[in-house]
A protein has these predicted regions:
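Enzymes that bind and transform nitrogen-containing heteroaromatic metabolites
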Residues: 1-189
Length: 189
C-alpha cells in the first residue's frame, strides 16, 4: 500500500503559516533544499489543499522558462509538471486533465482509495485544513517536518485538534546551519 507523507515547514509553536497565511518565516536555503528535493522527487502523487495548489500553480509552471531559475528550482518545476495532483477544493472547477483530480465532496475517500492503488508514495504539501482531515481519518503515514527557528504566536496550525492519538517512531532528525531541524516520523500501526 502507498504511504501518505506530510511535508511541511512548521514554526516551533506549531504553525504552517502566519495569521494572514504568510510563509515569510520559512528558511529554505540551499542546504535545506539539498535535503528536501531527494525526498520529493520519488513521490508520484502530490496532494494539495486549494490555497496551496493555487500558490504552486501560480509559480512552478513558469520556472522552466525563467533563465534566472536555480538548478533546484528547475528540478522541482520538472517534477511538478510531471506529477499527478489531487486537490481538495469545493470551489475550483472540475477538470478533464488526466494528471489532475479536483475533489470537493469526499477527499478522505479519494485519498483512501488512492492509497490502495499501485504507485509510489503520495505527499501532502502544507495544506493545514486538508492535513487535519486526513490525519483525523488516520491516512497520514509519515510526517516530514522542518521546524523553523521562529515562534509565530498564531496562524494556521499543523494540527487541528481532531486527530486521533498516534504513536510515532522517529526515523531521523537533522539540524541545519540555519537553525532549522528536519524530522522524519512514521506512524506506528
Amino acid at each position: 500500500m502507498r504511504s501518505v507523507i506530510q511535508l511541511a515547514h512548521v514554526s516551533l509553536d506549531g504553525f504552517l503559516a502566519g495569521p494572514d497565511g504568510e510563509f515569510d518565516f520559512v528558511v529554505f536555503d540551499d542546504e535545506l533544499q539539498d535535503h528536501i528535493y531527494p525526498l520529493v522527487l520519488p513521490v508520484d502523487t502530490a496532494i494539495y489543499g486549494r490555497t496551496t495548489y493555487q500558490l504552486m500553480e501560480g509559480y512552478w509552471p513558469s520556472v522552466l522558462d525563467d533563465p534566472e531559475a536555480s538548478a533546484h528550482g528547475r528540478t522541482h518545476a520538472r517534477w511538478y509538471a510531471s506529477v499527478k495532483k489531487i486537490v481538495a477544493s469545493r470551489t475550483l472547477p472540475r477538470t478533464r486533465t488526466p494528471a489532475l483530480t479536483i475533489e470537493g465532496d469526499d477527499i478522505v475517500g479519494t485519498i483512501a482509495a488512492a492509497k490502495r492503488e499501485p504507485g509510489g508514495d503520495m505527499m501532502i504539501f502544507a495544506s493545514p485544513t486538508l492535513t487535519h482531515a486526513l490525519a483525523a481519518a488516520g491516512l497520514v503515514d509519515e510526517w516530514r517536518l522542518t521546524w523553523q527557528p521562529v515562534i509565530l504566536g498564531g496562524g494556521l496550525p499543523l494540527f487541528g485538534g481532531k486527530e486521533a492519538r498516534s504513536r510515532l517512531e522517529l526515523r531521523s532528525s537533522r539540524t541545519f546551519r540555519s537553525g532549522v531541524i528536519a524530522t522524519h516520523h512514521v506512524v506506528k500501526r
